[in-house]
């Protein structure tokens, strides 16, 4: 997950209201992201899932 301050054309921006990029991993397999997208609040990690969040709404 790359977080970006500037907006090159090929980076996506999140819609209003969901202004954090995030990526979700299974704790057992951190190399394969399960889901990625935009979210309003960064979720807390659990025993099964680990979240990586940007503090910006621009990511790839």
From Swiss-Prot:
Q: Where in the cell is it found?
A: Secreted; Target cell membrane
Which UniProt keyword terms apply here?
Cardiotoxin, Cytolysis, Disulfide bond, Membrane, Secreted, Target cell membrane, Target membrane, Toxin
Source organism, top-level taxon: Eukaryota
Segment forming the signal sequence: none
CDD domains for the chain = TFP_snake_toxin
The GO biological-process annotations, alphabetized, read as: killing of cells of another organism
Describe, from its UniProt entry, the tissues in which this protein is expressed. Expressed by the venom gland.
Q: Name one Pfam family in it.
A: Toxin_cobra-type
Q: How does it assemble?
A: Monomer in solution; Homodimer and oligomer in the presence of negatively charged lipids forming a pore with a size ranging between 20 and 30 Angstroms.
Entry's family note: Belongs to the three-finger toxin family. Short-chain subfamily. Type IA cytotoxin sub-subfamily.
Q: What is this protein called?
A: Cytotoxin 1
Native source species: Naja kaouthia
């Amino acid at each position: 997950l790359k977080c970006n301050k500037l907006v090159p054309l090929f980076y996506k921006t999140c819609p209003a209201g969901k202004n954090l990029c995030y990526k979700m991993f299974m704790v057992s397999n951190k190399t394969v992201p399960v889901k990625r997208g935009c979210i309003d609040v960064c979720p807390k990690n659990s025993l099964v899932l680990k979240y990586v969040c940007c503090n910006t709404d621009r990511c790839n």
